[in-house]
Regions:
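Membrane-proximal intracellular helices of multi-pass ion channels
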Residues: 1-247
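Positively charged, low-complexity/disordered segments
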Residues: 249-251
Length: 251
């Protein structure tokens, strides 16, 4: 994408990447002229907030690397849009950015965009529910007799839903950890190993160091490439189908 070197091109593609990271149900509401319901989406607000915060803070962090703040803002916006929507495009090698910006990019790799969109990752809705459930558990520890309810999009969530989110996170972390351990046998540095697994499991594309936008996965061994391919399938199918397929059948 960087070969075009066209600000208009970058902004238009960046905006449309963000649009495809929005829950498609909201577009259905817009078609029905239910504008209030669409714009009141909690997940949409958090999603756009994450994009805005990441773009602005990365811009401030990398401003000294570019000839103007406008160029830094445009560059940060495109990379943030690409990573959070797991599109995988890049106009610069963000592996050369300062540490803060690189860390934000890795976090966005995990978060992903909205549920019901074209994006991979954990999904903003799951992240919201996970943190709300964690806050509820903390409140119960501090106030044992308090009765609290986790609400999402204005509706209370039952224990089955909360348990499903917790189980998904647990399985995700277990698969991530196991994959990192196995990929580390190839002997590459920690950042390369971790981000290679993260970018495959979340279907993003580029990571950091050896698998940065200007790098590739070519140097990994054949068994590791097969493992990363499995991670890509598992992440795209949201873990359960691939894990169930590889599980032994009950007798």
């Amino acid at each position: 994408m960087g070969a075009y070197n066209d600000p208009y091109f970058e902004v238009v593609i960046g905006v449309f990447m963000l649009l495809f990271g929005i829950n498609f149900n909201l577009y259905y509401f817009l078609l029905l002229r239910h504008f209030r319901e669409a714009l009141a989406s909690e997940e949409l607000h958090v999603y756009l907030g994450i994009v805005a915060f990441s773009t602005l803070t990365i811009t401030a962090n990398i401003a000294g690397l570019y000839d103007s703040v406008g160029t830094a803002l445009r560059t940060a916006f495109f990379q943030v849009s690409s990573i959070v929507t797991t599109t995988g495009y890049a106009t610069v090698d963000f592996n050369l950015w300062p540490t803060y910006s690189r860390v934000v990019i890795v976090i966005l790799t995990f978060v992903g965009a909205c549920a019901g969109s074209t994006a991979g990752g954990l999904k903003v809705s799951r992240v919201i529910i996970f943190f709300k459930a964690a806050r509820q558990d903390l409140n119960k520890m501090l106030h044992s007799h308090a009765v609290t309810t986790v609400r999402f999009e204005g509706k209370p969530l039952d224990e089955k839903t909360l348990r499903g989110v917790h189980n998904y996170f647990n399985i995700y972390i277990m698969l991530l950890t196991l994959s990192v351990l196995l990929v580390s046998l190839d002997g590459f540095d920690v950042v390369t190993t971790f981000t290679a697994v993260a970018t495959c499991l979340n279907n993003v594309g580029p990571g950091l160091e050896l698998v940065c936008p200007m790098g590739s996965f070519a140097d990994f061994s054949a068994p590791v490439k097969l493992l990363l391919a499995f991670d890509m399938l598992a992440g795209r199918l949201e873990l359960y189908p691939c894990l169930l397929y590889t599980s032994p059948s009950p007798r």
